[in-house]
Design a protein with these regions (language model features):
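Surface-exposed amphipathic alpha-helical segments
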Residues: 96-120
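Short, solvent-exposed recognition patches
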Residues: 1-95
Length: 120
């Protein structure tokens, strides 16, 4: 597994909840509590020719971000179906053989600020 993203910005009431590492599948899931919801970071490394399992969700693209000193772009989507009371947001990017996803229910500006302030 390559580098784990460091969250240099964390909103108030954003706290670590749990993590799970699956060495066989080469993936990591980290969860944070935020205002009675869960924000998750999912990482999958395909470096050992493992089967691709990107979880690309449908939604409206609201931003494409470039992080300073990084070679990849981050796509941010808003996801809401008829049963949701509040929007969810998801950010995706790939760096070489590693797929990253951050998702959860959060205010749009806070979510984008969280993603913009990721470092490796």
């Amino acid at each position: 597994m390559k580098n784990f993203p460091i969250l240099c910005y964390r909103p108030k009431d954003f706290n670590f909840r749990d993590y799970e590492i699956n060495f066989d599948m080469q993936n990591v899931l980290v969860e944070y509590n935020y205002n009675d919801t869960i924000i998750s970071i999912y990482i999958n490394d395909y470096g050992d020719n493992s089967k691709i399992q990107d979880y690309i969700l449908d939604g409206k693209i609201i931003a494409e971000l470039e992080l300073e000193d990084e070679t990849f772009d981050i796509e941010v989507k808003c996801i809401k179906d008829k049963f949701d009371k509040k929007e969810s947001y998801v950010a995706y990017w790939k760096d070489g053989t590693v797929f990253y996803q951050i998702s959860g229910k959060m205010e749009e500006k806070e979510f984008i600020k969280l993603v913009k302030n990721i470092r490796f």
